[in-house]
Amino acid sequence: MTIILFLVDTSSSMCQKAYVNGVQKTYLDIAKGAVETFLKYRQRTQDCLGDRYMLLTFEEPPANVKAGWKENHATFMNELKNLQSHGLTSMGESLRNAFDLLNLNRMQSGIDTYGQGRCPFYLEPSVIIVITDGGRYSYRNGVHQEIILPLSNQIPGTKFTKEPFRWDQRLFSLVLRMPGNKIDERVDGKVPHDDSPIERMCEVTGGRSYRVRSHYVLNQCIESLVQKVQPGVVLQFEPMLPKEATSATAGEAAGASTISGMGISSTSGAGPAPDIVFQPVKKMIYVQKHITQKTFPIGYWPLPEPYWPDSKAITLPPRDAHPKLKVLTPAVDEPQLVRSFPVDKYEIEGCPLTLQILNKREMNKCWQVIVTNGMHGFELPFGYLKAAPNFSQVHLYVLAYNYPALLPILHDLIHKYNMSPPSDLMYKFNAYVRSIPPYYCPFLRKALVNINVPYQLLQFLLPENVDNYLSPTIANQLKHIKNTAKQDQENLCMKVYKQLKQPKPPYRQVETGKLFTGAPLRRDLVRHPLLRDIFSKLHGEIDPVENYTIVVPQPTHQSSAKSHRNPFDIPRRDLVEEIAKMRETLLRPVSLVAKDSGHCLPIAEMGNYQEYLKNKDNPLREIEPTNVRQHMFGNPYKKDKHMVMVDEADLSDVAPMKSPNGNGPGGAPPGSPSGSGSPTGPGPSSPGSSPGGGSGPGMPGMPGMGGGMSGLMLGAGGSGGSSKKLDGTSRGRKRKAGPLPRSFEFRRSSTDSRSSSSGSESSTTGSAPGSPIPGATSSISGCDSAMGADGGPSSSCFDEDSNSNSSFVSSTSEASASDSGMSNSHLDPLRISFVFIEEETSDQDTPLNGYVHNFINGISDDAETGETEAVPGGASLPGASSANEPSSIGASPAVSATPATSVIPASNGSEVCSAVAAGSSSSISSSASSPGVLYVPLNGLTTHAAYSSNLGGPSSPLDNLSSLGGAAGGGGSGLLGVSKPGSLPLANGYGHGHSSAISPPSPLSLVPLSPLGTSTPAASSSGLSSSSAYFSHNDINDASEISRILQTCHNGTSSGSSVGAGASNSNLNGNGSTESGGGVSSDDHASLGGNSFDALKRTAGTAGSTAAGNPHYYWASGLNHHNNNNSSAAGAASGSTLSNNHNHRGHNNSSPNKLEVKINSSCGSSPTHNNGGMGSPGQSLPLIFTEEQREAARLHNVELRLQIFRDIRRPGRDYSQLLEHLNLVKGDQDMQSDFVDMCIVESLRFRRHRMASSIQEWWDRKQQLTAVGTNEATPSAEQAVAKS
């Protein structure tokens, strides 16, 4: 905080006038204008925010303080305008009062630190600006020729300093020497110093005086003063030779003073000659604010006191206001500083001393400085002077006292002994501590902490008891002075406040006017010859008047306006006068010369508009107020603020759109946010699922699943990662405002919302990390589903996409518990009617007929009606929902009726893997879907079929998964069979999945399981996933289906299935295999090699786990049917493991002979990865890349990614260039699939759903072309495999 104190001379001599800009002004008015100009210039600088302005006059205290510590800026300006000239020119007393006002605050803040060193960073910079006329100094006892500052002991703490001022207080004076006549104002050169006694006072404090001769010079002086207002302290620099030269010179001078004004004359040759010679000078060192602390400066080292502190002294000797620093000559080498050792650096104001140092231009030389203390007998350096590297300024470096002895000790402590000093180094350090003033110890401790000295060593080197260097008497004295100064300042502020509250006469500025005589009088004013001589004499006596200024008289009494409404209010003596005024007012209502008495206001009151507005009457109301229009339905002027986004991002806000490939509402591809699934890659996982899709806690042995899997896994607490966010595509078209018509039917539009219950998101991406299958995305299919009155679900579905995804939900079952908690989908009791636009038909050329599949599966209409029964209490019907609303509706655990019975809700767009895990908790996450076939395991061997609508053309059915888990104590193994909708369960547990649609029968009542022959499985759970499809029933399709069936049967393939309670028979491809009994062991599976579907089976051993992927070619539709049997056998001590199968394939329904072979042996395996060991002739072999080729392809794709991302960000809907660049992607199937998924995610990040759909469509088409090319190349081989 910078204090700027204006001391304005208010003596009577300030009434003299000066000629300023053609107008005569008094010195006091000029002084007021100078203060206002200073404030205006100061406000342009950066440091003006922390300024405090004070205003003092030459009056007696406390009336001399017009604005002190407590007054604000408004009070300062008001008091400045009201200053008046009266009193004496008591310069000395006024200066003393100004210093005392400043020193009171210093004593209570304690920034002077008496007896504890002098810290330059503890400062309160103050500038005292005296504006006077430079006349004689008149006091009450006479006129004096010099300034006398009276010594007053009223202010506490004055005896500690010899002078009344401090080292951060400077005095400047503006001495007005402006004449009363017109002169040339512009003066070249610098403004001279004044020769009055005030000049010597200014030089003592480190300031100067200005001799002001004109108003132009006054503005120059004010600009100079504004530049000098900088934080800093004033020091006195004196020259000094080394001690031997000083003693030699002292001996020759016979006791005379060796130090003269010009330095030391080196007459003796005992010492070196000084390299710099200068006179003692008082100059300022600038103490700048710290970089990190913008409010106050930060320092580390004090300047030593001029005396050695004595702990037994009862008082402190007085110090000089400005420290006297002795500069040692000649220069010495700059000391080597320790890293992180604190050093204070201050810039020195320009002077002859700094000029000589700069002229030396010595880079590594410095001049040491000391402070003389005659009491102790010797002086040691505490800093040095050194030029800046650019030789533009000189800096004062302040370090510890006797730093030449300290720095080598610290260097050895850090670099030589590594903070483990020996005893001799400790002795040296203790000797150094005893040789410095005690008040340096706290600063030295902070410096040692800065260089990372350990705390234990620091306590040993500098114990805290050395800080008590002041005697108790002096400490108590300083504390008492501080309290007294605080009380005195409060009393002074209260006196100032009271005297400012006293009423003052209003200030009125003197109004002046100039007289212009106009044209000069002509000589021939009178043309008559007899009168010309007489008037010529009178004309000669008239003196010309030029630039004469007169003072306009001010009315002292303002006549109030009179009202003559009541004539009895007029006094009798004023009747005659008032009648004349009334007559004049009546006959002439507007006076030519209006009275201005009502407009005469003081300047200070002219800007007070608030009081005028308060007293002003409110305007009258209107006679006929206008009615304000009320808008009944909102604000008609309010505009819809739709943000303009890039490309087609905001089109879905108006109405849901359909993409060309029918990927759900808004054209969002599956896996995108509008497709209700997490994007590619691992999603948020629940407790029990790792983020990367691997095994999590509570699910031992479970392989890593895809990113879509993580969004569907449920832990013990419920949903993990379920989202409640509504997509922008869920907003339908807005109805126009107005009343509803009578025939209006309310229909709730479909929304892509997520349930807030424990059910997790459905229809997520099914690609596992590491599964490079492109196009393995979820198909959002439309379904109209409603629960009938009798509780039976009815559904009608239509296909909207040619791609379907298999996303997996993992569930585990307790091995020791008698019941398994499962999450079942419950139907919302609210009846909802969904509206869908069935514009697009199925992309399937010849869709499978539902009646044909009923005939194939042996499900007749009679059986359908006969099986419609109530569901047991242990099972819960799967809820019906739309595919456009794939939300999990209230998944809640339910207890099964029998210990080993699992109720599996049909999941639209997702597939459920189930496992038997000993010791793991059971939780099945299911998404709400249309009702489907429930294949309930009977005796662990066969499954019974309830209704399921198999949707989507190229679906990815879940192949049969059997898990063999060892019982807790038995050696046998139980089988858990999971079959696809429409598949034929076999006796050996192999189910054949069909891509078909079965007509909706009634739900199946659960059949209790009979115990197995060898062992009892702990629990069993099965999962089922169905994809939606729409099949039209017409004669052409029926004929096509029948012809396909007959053709296949002609080739010798037949199949039949029987569902029984204890046994199951299955016949596939003419080879029958019958298993009777309760259990199937791994040895049984190994002995099934005679069957045709075991041709690709691979056995890993009798004790290990066996996994086989078997392609079966079913005669129903020309589609591929994969049956993979994953059996895991474990011992009694180990838990069972789960093996899942992701089977992704593309359909080609144009020909029944086009078959595709996929062999998958593990969860997330590639469609082209052969794990069987024996490849069939119809299998498409993958491209095998070496590591070098993969690395080269990866680098190529990285460079290509920049260009493709640039194409994604480019506005517009022409994606031809983007697709051309996508064709340049290199690598195997995994790398290309990952790259396409990354591009889809990037396009969705910019909300470019149509671009993502185009990329997905391009990739699917490319995959289909690849598959078609492979299949056409080997038709005969496929037929041979089918016949085998």
UniProtKB/Swiss-Prot annotation:
What GO MF terms are annotated? enzyme-substrate adaptor activity; protein phosphatase regulator activity
Q: Which Gene3D superfamilies match?
A: von Willebrand factor, type A domain
**Any Pfam family matching the protein:** INT_SG_DDX_CT_C
Where in the sequence does UniProt note compositional bias of the Polar residues kind?
879-890, 1159-1171
InterPro entries this protein is in? INT_SG_DDX_CT_C, Integrator_subunit6, VWF_A, vWFA_dom_sf
Q: Is Nucleus there in the keyword field?
A: yes
Tell me, in one coarse class, where this protein mainly resides. Answer: nucleus
Q: Name one GO biological process term.
A: snRNA processing
**Ranges of biased composition (kind: Low complexity):** 752-781, 803-824, 1053-1074, 1125-1141
Kindly indicate whether the keyword Nucleus belongs to this entry: yes
The Gly residues compositionally biased stretches are 690-721
Quick one: where's region Disordered?
653-824, 864-895, 1053-1086, 1125-1180
Q: Name one GO cellular component term.
A: nucleus
Q: Where's it found, cell-wise?
A: Nucleus
Q: Which UniProt keywords apply?
A: Nucleus
- Give the quaternary structure: Belongs to the multiprotein complex Integrator, at least composed of IntS1, IntS2, IntS3, IntS4, omd/IntS5, IntS6, defl/IntS7, IntS8, IntS9, IntS10, IntS11, IntS12, asun/IntS13, IntS14 and IntS15. The core complex associates with protein phosphatase 2A subunits mts/PP2A and Pp2A-29B, to form the Integrator-PP2A (INTAC) complex.
PANTHER family, alphabetized = DEAD/H BOX POLYPEPTIDE 26/DICE1-RELATED, INTEGRATOR COMPLEX SUBUNIT 6
Role? Component of the integrator complex, a multiprotein complex that terminates RNA polymerase II (Pol II) transcription in the promoter-proximal region of genes. The integrator complex provides a quality checkpoint during transcription elongation by driving premature transcription termination of transcripts that are unfavorably configured for transcriptional elongation: the complex terminates transcription by (1) catalyzing dephosphorylation of the C-terminal domain (CTD) of Pol II subunit Polr2A/Rbp1 and Spt5, and (2) degrading the exiting nascent RNA transcript via endonuclease activity.
According to UniProt, the name of this protein is Integrator complex subunit 6
From which lineage does this chain's organism come?
Eukaryota, Metazoa, Ecdysozoa, Arthropoda, Hexapoda
